Amino acid sequence: MDHKIDLLQPALEAALAGKIQALVRDRGELTLTVTAADYLAVCTTLRDHAELKLEQLIDLCGLDYSSYKDGAGSPYTEGPRYCVVLHLLSVSKNWRLRLKVFCADDGLPVVPSVNEIWAAANWFEREAFDLYGIVFEGHADLRRILTDYGFIGHPFRKDFPTTGHVEMRYDAEQRRVIYQPVTIEPREITPRIIREDNYGGLH
């Protein structure tokens, strides 16, 4: 696959001159990072350019980099918190690309929707909105897809409580499911490692 990357990398550099924030080659894969302002134009070029032809969106997801701020030596200790990651495939040229775009505002993370470029983005963008609160501007039907309509918050954010905000139970008197405050007390869980001789057949 390295010979494919040898062809894809210069093609990206030529087609996206001035719009590449970072282009990293690692473990036989290319990761392209662009700004939110260039995101739509770059996606259109990636799909339509004769030398790139990344016609298929395989996956799109959100990321919350807030916990990286505590990690030493990470490239994500500074900068935006939320990121959208796309995995693209060229069926005609048989190569793949990872595309990353960071949301400019941590308070209200917004990036343009690519649903008009790749129709497969529709439910992926709804999922990232539901789980991370990332708003995809221009999406025709941006509503929750995994949690219920009354859900409070976005459960994949690093600051979302593991117990949640409310719990549901069936009330026999009302004969329906009701919401109530969480009855589990928050606690700190410390993992314990128990080492035993000959554990797992190891000596």
UniProtKB/Swiss-Prot annotation:
GO MF, one example: quinone binding
Keyword Translocase: yes
Membrane topology note: Peripheral membrane protein
This protein's UniProt keywords: Cell inner membrane, Cell membrane, Membrane, NAD, Quinone, Translocase, Transport, Ubiquinone
Entry EC number(s): 7.1.1.-
Family matches, as InterPro entries: NADH_DH_suC (IPR010218), NADH_quin_OxRdtase_su_C/D-like (IPR037232), NADH_UbQ_OxRdtase_30kDa_su (IPR001268), NADH_UbQ_OxRdtase_CS (IPR020396)
Role played: NDH-1 shuttles electrons from NADH, via FMN and iron-sulfur (Fe-S) centers, to quinones in the respiratory chain. The immediate electron acceptor for the enzyme in this species is believed to be ubiquinone. Couples the redox reaction to proton translocation (for every two electrons transferred, four hydrogen ions are translocated across the cytoplasmic membrane), and thus conserves the redox energy in a proton gradient.
This protein's name: NADH-quinone oxidoreductase subunit C
Organism whose genome encodes this protein: Methylibium petroleiphilum (strain ATCC BAA-1232 / LMG 22953 / PM1)
